[in-house]
Amino acid sequence: SPYTLEEVVARNYLINEHPDVILNIVDGTNLERNLYLTTQLTELGIPVVMAINMMDIVKKNDDKINVKELSRELGVTIVEISALKGNGIMDAAEAALQAAKVGRTIPMHTFSGAVEHAIAHIEEAVLHDMPEDQQRWYAIKIFERDDKVLAKLNLSKEVLAHIEKDIQAAEKELDDDAESIITNERYIYIASIIKGCYKKKTAGKLSTSDKIDKVVTN
């Protein structure tokens, strides 16, 4: 869920304006941190193209990103770029145009059984009149009890009470609150992807992003 003003504005634009395609630029030297947003973007029903930036530095460090496998795991087209050197920019733009023609991105990630049961029930009970490609994102946000989404949908007390039973059942089974369940399961999913797709030669060495963060926060 977004908390900063910038995140709220960006999310509202994507949901309300429903652009033809999302070009998701991620830092290849700190891939794991960036994938959390990517998993959310793929649930919006909008085609997603990932541009992995700083690939020149990734290769210089002799790290390995299995782009083909990463693309398969996430269900998105991936292009390697170096914004600083201007490499791959046109390829990313062309990939975005092609993705817009093809249509929606199908999210590859599924949550645990209890969560998926609740999400399916929410889609059926609340979101059946909404465009199909937007239903999953809204259902996940309802499951998380996202205040802004609930305010926008303005659901009746009866409907809220109905779906709350499934949410509470998932919370009881997984022994956590709904928002934390979604967050934790995303991170577990991302960790499994990184394990299979990202090999870091310089284990223990700080990435460029981490170095910047360290300077800024000290």
Regions found by a protein language model. Name each.
Residues S1:
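Conserved nucleotide-sensing/catalytic segment adjacent to the nucleotide-binding pocket
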Residues L5-V79:
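Conserved C-terminal guanine-recognition region of P-loop GTPase G domains, centered on the G4
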Residues V8, I188, L206-D210:
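Alpha-helical membrane and juxtamembrane elements of multi-pass inner-membrane transport
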Residues V49, K59-A203:
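Alpha-helical transmembrane helix bundles of large polytopic membrane transport and channel proteins
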Residues S209, D213-T217:
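Alpha-helical membrane-interface segments at transmembrane helix boundaries
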